[in-house]
Regions:
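Short, glycine/acidic-rich hinge or "gate" loops at secondary-structure transitions
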Residues: 138-148
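Short acidic, Gly/Pro-enriched loop/turn segments at secondary-structure junctions
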Residues: 227-229
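N-terminal, intrinsically disordered, polar/charged segments of Gram-positive cell-envelope systems
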Residues: 287-289
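Short basic/glycine-enriched coil/helix segment immediately N-terminal to the Walker B
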Residues: 149-158
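Small-molecule kinase domains that catalyze NTP-dependent phosphoryl transfer to phosphate-bearing small molecules
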Residues: 245-255
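P-loop NTPase catalytic phosphate-binding loop
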Residues: 2-5, 9-139, 158-224, 233, ...
Length: 301
């Protein structure tokens, strides 16, 4: 779905959304369409829709993957209430890209996890939570998360963001991690439990084909060559992208072809920390209610 905005309001003001709000569902402002009038349209995707509960993000080194994840996290943290989303952050490189987000009350334990034992615990707990929620839905006479919320109940969406997934390939726990990720991918949709996998290497021996199948939203940035592009998105073409920060999203439900878009640029870590601190320093005492805002800056050509 595309959002109509004005050039003067680009990225840094409240937008006219038609009937969409970033505070609802699990919406991600992907960026501008890369076409003759891309300054007029913003592409927003909603992972709360049944068709795209999980996502895969891939690129070469420096291709724009981590920048995109930062923009995604910032928009969720700044637009969604604390009680509406639980963020679990995992990064095989230790989480330096995401340190600025750890003060946000949405982030589980205010940590970004790297240790394999912690990762397995997070994934096991997510699967148990899926089973628990399904029992809760039965008791409430609801078929799924959406119906449960529509009945007036409260429940947070749980989102696991797992960056640098391929770094665990070859470790003693890799098969366990992959098995538990697969379970979440196949059962989490109806329970409001989502997982986003990001990696530079998406060969079939790294990322199981069944996991890929259950991640219909695929966002690919600059790749090294045609085979790298096919590993990430199932299509050639990502190797032709010339600019960092320009991504292609494949398999979006708006058509059967890919959509090329220009991503937003993440603010600096200092700016992110300031925004999060200013909004949530008193969140336990006073509920902060603000209009939705796209957070990010226009990438330079």
């Amino acid at each position: 779905m595309d959002i109509i905005i004005t050039k003067d309001d680009l990225f840094n003001r409240v937008f006219e959304y038609q009937d969409m709000k970033l505070s609802e569902g699990l919406k991600i402002p992907l960026g501008h369409f890369v076409n003759q009038d891309y300054l007029e349209k913003m592409l927003v995707i909603d992972m709360a829709k049944d068709e795209i509960p999980h996502a895969f993000i891939g690129s070469t080194t420096g291709g724009g993957k981590s920048n995109f994840i930062r923009v995604m996290l910032l928009n969720w943290i700044m637009n969604k209430k604390v009680e509406d989303i639980e963020l679990y952050l995992i990064d095989g490189k230790g989480g330096t890209d995401y340190v600025a987000f750890l003060e946000a009350p949405h982030v589980f334990m205010n940590k970004c996890f790297k240790d394999e034992d912690d990762i397995i615990t997070i994934l096991e707990d997510a699967h148990r939570e899926i089973l628990r929620r399904n029992q809760t839905f039965i008791q409430a006479k609801a078929n799924n998360f959406k119906e449960y919320i529509e009945l007036g109940n409260k429940m947070a969406r749980r989102v696991i963001v797992f960056d640098e997934y391929a770094m665990y390939h070859g470790t003693s726990d890799y098969n366990v991690i992959q098995s538990k990720v697969s379970k979440i991918c196949s059962t989490g949709r109806s329970a409001g439990v989502h997982i986003i996998i990001a990696t530079q290497d998406a060969r079939k021996e790294i990322l199981d084909s069944m996991i890929k199948y259950n991640m219909p939203l695929k966002i690919g940035f600059k790749c090294d060559n045609a085979q790298h592009s096919k590993n990430i998105s199932g299509h050639e073409g990502l190797e032709t992208i010339n600019k960092i920060g320009v991504g292609r999203a494949y398999g979006l439900p708006i058509d059967s072809d890919y959509v090329q878009f220009k991503t937003m640029k993440s603010p600096s870590s200092k700016e992110i920390r300031t925004m999060i601190h200013n909004k949530y320093k008193d969140y336990k005492k006073v509920e902060v209610v603000e209009e939705d805002v796209f957070f990010g800056e226009e990438c330079e050509d």
